[in-house]
From Swiss-Prot:
Name under which the protein is recorded: DNA/RNA-binding protein Alba
Cellular component, GO, one term: cytoplasm
Family of this protein: Belongs to the histone-like Alba family.
Role according to the record: Binds double-stranded DNA tightly but without sequence specificity. Involved in DNA compaction.
Domain of life the protein comes from: Archaea
A family per Pfam: Alba
Localization: Cytoplasm; Chromosome
Gene name as annotated: albA
SUPFAM superfamilies: AlbA-like
MF-aspect GO terms: double-stranded DNA binding; RNA binding
GO BP, one annotated term: chromosome condensation
Annotated Gene3D superfamilies: Alba-like domain
InterPro entries reported in the protein's UniProt record: Alba-like_dom_sf, DNA/RNA-bd_Alba, DNA/RNA-bd_Alba-like
Keywords: Chromosome, Cytoplasm, DNA condensation, DNA-binding
Length: 89
């Protein structure tokens, strides 16, 4: 499934437009919004703007929370929170 939008450091509207594009031009029934760390709040903002303002017919199917274990520069293991929001129409 290629209908995944990874949320990072760009502005919220960039990701909102990416989700809307996936639903409209790709004719997708589901779009997954993924983020980790500090970008989690931005991913929630994207979901809220899509479902409340731009595409009210889109609903939340599932929200998954988790933790990624990544290796720090000093060799220590770091836990980073992750979120996956599955939207459908």
């Amino acid at each position: 499934m290629d209908n995944i939008v990874y949320v990072g450091n760009k502005g919220v509207m960039n990701y909102v437009l990416a989700v809307i594009t996936q639903f409209n031009s790709e004719n997708a029934q589901e779009v997954i919004v993924k983020a980790r760390g500090k970008a989690i709040s931005r991913a929630v903002d994207v979901e809220e703007m899509v479902t409340k303002r731009f595409m009210p017919e889109v609903k939340i199917k599932e929200i998954n929370l988790g933790t990624d274990h990544i290796q720090g520069e000093d060799g220590k293991s770091i836990n980073v929170s992750t979120i996956e929001i599955i939207l459908f129409k």
